[in-house]
Amino acid sequence: MAGASVKVAVRVRPFNSREMSRDSKCIIQMSGSTTTIVNPKQPKETPKSFSFDYSYWSHTSPEDINYASQKQVYRDIGEEMLQHAFEGYNVCIFAYGQTGAGKSYTMMGKQEKDQQGIIPQLCEDLFSRINDTTNDNMSYSVEVSYMEIYCERVRDLLNPKNKGNLRVREHPLLGPYVEDLSKLAVTSYNDIQDLMDSGNKPRTVAATNMNETSSRSHAVFNIIFTQKRHDAETNITTEKVSKISLVDLAGSERADSTGAKGTRLKEGANINKSLTTLGKVISALAEMDSGPNKNKKKKKTDFIPYRDSVLTWLLRENLGGNSRTAMVAALSPADINYDETLSTLRYADRAKQIRCNAIINEDPNNKLIRELKDEVTRLRDLLYAQGLGDITDMTNALVGMSPSSSLSALSSRAASVSSLHERILFAPGSEEAIERLKETEKIIAELNETWEEKLRRTEAIRMEREALLAEMGVAMREDGGTLGVFSPKKTPHLVNLNEDPLMSECLLYYIKDGVTRVGREDAERRQDIVLSGHFIKEEHCIFRSDSRGGGEAVVTLEPCEGADTYVNGKKVTEPSILRSGNRIIMGKSHVFRFNHPEQARQERERTPCAETPAEPVDWAFAQRELLEKQGIDMKQEMEQRLQELEDQYRREREEATYLLEQQRLDYESKLEALQKQMDSRYYPEVNEEEEEPEDEVQWTERECELALWAFRKWKWYQFTSLRDLLWGNAIFLKEANAISVELKKKVQFQFVLLTDTLYSPLPPDLLPPEAAKDRETRPFPRTIVAVEVQDQKNGATHYWTLEKLRQRLDLMREMYDRAAEVPSSVVEDCDNVVTGGDPFYDRFPWFRLVGRAFVYLSNLLYPVPLVHRVAIVSEKGEVKGFLRVAVQAISADEEAPDYGSGVRQSGTAKISFDDQHFEKFQSESCPVVGMSRSGTSQEELRIVEGQGQGADAGPSADEVNNNTCSAVPPEGLMDSPEKAALDGPLDTALDHLRLGSTFTFRVTVLQASSISAEYADIFCQFNFIHRHDEAFSTEPLKNTGRGPPLGFYHVQNIAVEVTKSFIEYIKSQPIVFEVFGHYQQHPFPPLCKDVLSPLRPSRRHFPRVMPLSKPVPATKLSTMTRPSPGPCHCKYDLLVYFEICELEANGDYIPAVVDHRGACMGTFLLHQGIQRRITVTLLHETGSHIRWKEVRELVVGRIRNTPETDEALIDPNILSLNILSSGYVHPAQDDRVFFGNDTRTFYQFEAAWDSSMHNSLLLNRVTPYREKIYMTLSAYIEMENCTQPAVITKDFCMVFYSRDAKLPASRSIRNLFGSGSLRATEGNRVTGVYELSLCHVADAGSPGMQRRRRRVLDTSVAYVRGEENLAGWRPRSDSLILDHQWELEKLSLLQEVEKTRHYLLLREKLETTQRPGPEVLSPASSEDSESRSSSGASSPLSAEGQPSPLEAPNERQRELAVKCLRLLMHTFNREYTHSHVCISASESKLSEMSVTLMRDPSMSPLGAATLTPSSTCPSLIEGRYGATDVRTPQPCSRPASPEPELLPELDSKKTPSPVRATETEKEPQRLLVPDIQEIRVSPIVSKKGYLHFLEPHTAGWAKRFVVVRRPYAYMYNSDKDTVERFVLNLSTAQVEYSEDQQAMLKTPNTFAVCTEHRGILLQANSDKDMHDWLYAFNPLLAGTIRSKLSRRRSAQMRV
């Protein structure tokens, strides 16, 4: 085994965070034991290969089959070396490599079981093999030592007493060793593990740019492993001693890479020095052991520099000496570390050539002791020869003592013999001889020490370590873990009493023996206690601790000159002795309590009944004590101040009351004067024009009823409003369908009309907000326009409101834009998954409503049992099946019949009807039942609620059943048959319905039949018409569609306390039955499996965007009605900068740091409790129509910790800010885009923001980790020539840190500021892009004119991208209204049929039972009822309903009808047509004809369905759909030179007539309505890079960084710039490309971009780059250019 080479292994680690952030590439490849490295700077260079004993590939994850784990590394290296140790050899394993390469991880690892390194695994395996030994003649002992080499100094990591640096000495026999290094005996692996943890804690580590926990020292873990074998035959014990050295080296580093400065730089220099020496030693040993040099003579250069470094000196035996050595070279795989990695490989390759001459260390102690004794004899003879023989006796006395005992004895003897020192000093060589003698005696004593003595010494050191920690106030558990911290038991100390302990840096300070200095960190002399603050001097005071008689320590406080120091509230100027419990104040804010444990203990012994203070001694106590000593009475001062404030408040309140009263009187006088002036101006004119009043016409009762009926009908007429909604929203519906087809969502959208009827009640989410307000006053049910969403993939149908469609459409557009950049495979996978985040899909329930049925309860009045067979009607009026229900009155204890499989309910449901609103409902003829709880059991009580429309509120051709209207047309409406029969005095109710008694009846759900097989799992639930709590439900039944009917046989007993409202309810109101089933007939069955398939992870993830909030309501501005905007006059793109400035120490307001990462596009990093200002800067192109006048108000509110906000809630935290300044400013240097003068307009305003005024905890506290605070800001800015202020709204994202926190700049910010091209403050802003639209004010006119001017143009004719894929699909229009009328008629007839069937069934039952019934149930009454019910009026939506036949109209009535007809057939007036809509005469006739067809009830539905307005009118959709999106042959927006005769109105406004000149001068007319909308920045980047810009009349080209996010191009100063400096709207700009122009200007690769305000010439780096930019700016133009180039090349090739 002797002469073996060093085992060398290399191991490559994964990328760290630093390398991943720089997108590093792997340059290391491993194949077997061969390692190859590639030069990233010269890829064509041949890779360098190295061969080692082991090559470990740990770059990938553990799932990789080639991954080398910690276990594998130990199995290959550690187990072999441990085996050598058991054989008796010295063993060494050390790790080598650059910093952060993974050396410590390989050697020491982590705490996890599978992450442990070589050292823990080797120790565990060592004791495992020891414990597995069964030979009784073998005994083992293990000693460990742990040291670190820091800055060429050795420190003991196991003994806390060895705080100083240890000396490295060299013995002729032992070689280099560390003097006084602790060697602790261990008996188990747990002991070693505890020692390793204790040694790793004080080890020196620090953070660098390369590694967050960089080892700043070399660590050497030594194990002395002794094996004793007792030979029973010879009675001889032999020993084998092995030394196991496990070395964790610090990594080599470069100062520029690690960013080392100061102490880190000094540490790195020492690390590099020792590693350089190690490299020299390895190289020298490799050269000595190499073949060619063996036969040569030893040269001077063969000297091996072991002594140049402490590391190599201690490892001398392990490098080419008596040791079995293994080296692990740790490698970094990143290309940025190529040089360091190549150097490591070369050193490892040289280390392979080193050969070590290892020998078995057998019986070393006997030989060593003999040689040491000979050396002692020789040294003693040397002393005798020099005349120092009397020292021999002293030395003999020390033999056999422990090293510590011998040293103490020698010291005491030397102190007593003064002449001995003189003799030693003057004797030549005597001092060296004595030193060597001491050294030898220490070694002999250590060798003679028994194993038990070593264990006792180890335990004593452990006790000393725990005692030292206990004295410092650290409590330890028995297993060595930390238990807690307590006050020291002996040492005097200072306890911090500050409210904020961070102000005084530490909670507790120790006062050491001697002098303890207190001062600032920048003092010339080093201070023991360092404090900071304005009133702390460089050397503030001194604590002097002296020991007096009896061992008592006395602490004296000595203040320095000019330092403010107080003890118990008194200022100290001379040295003062401190007593335990004294309060010490240094400066103004540092408050401490002095504690002296020994002194306090003695005082308690002297006075055992010492009084405790009445209040705790804390910071407040010390401050009050200081004020009292200074003669300041805070209580009296506060009372005086409070009295002054009260007096001031009283005076100001009286003054304000007086001023308010005076102002009120002034306003009243002014109003009276104005009123008199108006009366005098108008009354004479009115009197002159006044005609003689006509006699009041007396209407008959029939005429009043007719007028009331007509008024009510036309008030709730909905035809025109429904048509407007259908026409105005058609373009949204078309776009949604087009996107659905292109994204293959299999979802279709179509308009649908929904009416709130009994058979189709509207869910709350479809009702508009004002529905709840007018529900009580509305006589007809509400009809709304909704969107029917047919999810063909999942077989589901949903209904959306129009507002929800618009919201979802925004998300669809984003998904469509993203899909253009995502691979098609990913898009298809996205289609197969239904998630909550997909805007096309909604969650759908398992059960679907089949239909509803109604059962009336009037048979309970007689009472007779009835079995009803009622139709199950769907919301569309289709009969889906039939339901058999039995209703009968029963006694309270009657049992339910046995139906076999029927279900018997466990108890009787108790219902309570309240009469408190009965008189009100009786007067209104509305059978609405009010409910309240009675005294019955709350567990079984069910409440019927009385809110909502009447039970028969569905639309009907016959208003007989509405029961909600007090005004009816004569002979047109009548009460229902049942109600007519049963109306009468309630006092005459039958005996079974006595008021106050309990009435019990039974409802039995028998069977359901004729339900289609497409519905499975049928169940039924029923409830009272107005109840909204839990319904009565049956169990689900399987439905096959064949065989006998479904038998529910569900019995429910209901007990009611008879009240007037209950009797009124059973007279006219039904019970509603709802039948549900699982719809199992899927439209596309093969797609079901795709829906459940998991989505593969997308290769691209787009950032989450913040929602756009609505403006925060203004607090100071009066509520103004927004005027109706007319045609758009002009549009501007606004670039807005938002800054939050914080007050700095120098008094300036500096913009707060902004982190531009994340979905918020900018997060403000703010400090807690600092004054702030908000600065807003507006940038836009200079134009004549946009002039900012002043900022009316700036409001902030909606404080929240989520991006979303509930805008419906009233925010109490809205705050109006104080505007400090506003006006036009000059652009900053960094905001300029071009070299010339920036012609853009910069308008800036600033406001003070006190976040504490919001009274919000989110703004007052420090933001928790991973949380962000959101706030909405709205600025109301007044503009010239505008009717109202423009509103700019922005959502802020903020994070609050503590006041003194140092904000770490993000990586992007560091890159930005480190480049030196931009100032730090210029990047600390958040940008927003807005679109300003200035529209003309639409003239109000008369109500009739307003109706004719309503924007009812059909938007379905506007072109939408992708509508070619709709295959002729068109949104429903006017025909939908007529079809919905037929559905309502059908529902009304079905309802009448059910009522009549119930009436006939009840009458037949009464006749068969011979019960006397009311007269009205006779056949004559029935016929009369039927005749009267057949003459009802139509529903409020019907245009065909007419009152009953009347007498012939007179002349006045005919004139009124003709006038109404003219108004209905009137077209747009000439003014509106000329000013806003370019429409021809023929088109006007077409529109007139269409309106006529729509209003003519004689036309067929097919004719009415062809309603379409002119397709040449401009689109009414603003924002996303401009004028170019609609097919307009002659767009008339913004003509170049308008003709006076075509625009008379406009000319009159521009040049007012002389008659109205005075009025114009008095009050200028404002014509425009501003509208500012924030533009959501697209996450899709079409292209980004540098472009050169050239503007006319500028100095030269400007290089700018451009990012294209359609439809905008954003320009930055550089790629490190985070703030947009210029925005170019590509949708309105014109891109021009000309090869002739390039040749003429001699500027290749250029193209021009022209806007309304400027023209820019852009130059790309290459021809290909230019075409890429053209494609990003204008894809159609780029395609045209490429097509021309292709044709040109083809022609050239043919030639």
Curated annotation (Swiss-Prot):
Residues 366-383, 429-462, 622-681, 801-822 form a coiled coil. The gene is Kif1a. Residues 1417-1441 have a biased composition (Low complexity). It comes from Mus musculus. The lineage of its organism: Eukaryota, Metazoa, Chordata, Craniata, Vertebrata. The modification Phosphothreonine is found at residues 607, 612, 1524, 1528. Residues 516-572 form the FHA domain. InterPro entries: FHA_dom, FHA_KIF1A, Kinesin-like, Kinesin-like_KIF1-typ, Kinesin_assoc, Kinesin_motor_CS, Kinesin_motor_dom, Kinesin_motor_dom_sf. Belongs to the TRAFAC class myosin-kinesin ATPase superfamily. Kinesin family. Unc-104 subfamily. This is Kinesin-like protein KIF1A.
